[in-house]
């Protein structure tokens, strides 16, 4: 087990680091309200929405956490040419990120919409295009990430299997970071660990590790 003092030192060091994060962004919508009746149209609860919250999730959550710990974060990701993608761009501004998402006109921005009554989640609806990037967009990701990594101290690859981190992008970025002597940390949702060959650290949770072995 890592000593607490070492963890504190590592977190403190983040305040002076620049981190390049590349990966899948999602738009997380939360609709909070109350349930007082069942719909006459179907046997489902009717949520009276009282409050709505939006934030960037998936790799965006990694970036938000890095910023919260004092790091200077850069973010390379892809959204669709839709209202959700526009909202992600505005949330980038709220986080004071100097980056803007790459826009793929053939792609739908990954969005998760949750309806919550009290402490109970009633429903989650997903919109996404979980397929690999076309070569043109893939190359834009590689080129932008290469430029950003040159200004950073480390590389975080946040792979939620939505297509941004292709095999080619992973191989080129991990190789580039290694040549530059910069550590590579992988945050993943999946079981294909061979794709991250050359990374310094992979961070599965217990279930993901069990699935992989």
Give the positions of each predicted feature.
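Ribokinase/PfkB-type carbohydrate-kinase core domain
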Residues: 1-36, 48-213
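Active-site gating loops and adjacent loop-to-helix segments of metal-dependent hydrolytic enzymes
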Residues: 42-45
